[in-house]
Amino acid sequence: MAENFSFDVVSDFDRQELVNALDQVKREISQRYDLKGTDTSLDLEKDNIFITTNSELTLNSVIDIIRQKAIKRKLSIKIFDFNSIEVVSGNKVKQTITLKKGLNQEIAKKISKNIRDEIKKINVSINGETLRVMSKSKNDLQLAIKLLENLEETYKIPLQTNNYR
């Protein structure tokens, strides 16, 4: 029985769930007493979320709401990379949140090395923004999945496994 079992490791998120979470945030901003009249705007573009509001205090409140709604929609808050706060025209502040998606080559190599160092009978290959983990034993693959859960905290990126064969 020389059959190989495998799974893929990706760093991804459900964009529709993110859109739904941001819609809930916009609704809450318009309804909350402390945020009414703050002229807060929330815009989602390809890989960025732009928040513009009157003060840093309001900005921090909006960021907290974004985190809460993302968690409720089963999105990892590790997908958010918060850039520095900019002061724009007048008294307004703006923050850009970059959305992390995909494994870059550097992190993929580190994860691959960590898996191979821990579990000797396993093969890991890098395919673009995904890692393919292969082994003849399903038990080794299950150990690799447990190891990936720990590496997720180490590298501060969301990792998912799919295509388990």
Curated annotation (Swiss-Prot):
Keywords: Nucleotide-binding
Keyword ATP-binding attributed: no
Keyword NAD: no
One GO MF term attached to the UniProt entry: nucleotide binding
Gene3D superfamilies in UniProt: 3.30.70.860, YajQ-like, domain 2 (3.30.70.990)
SUPFAM superfamilies: YajQ-like
Protein name per its UniProtKB record: Nucleotide-binding protein PMM0481
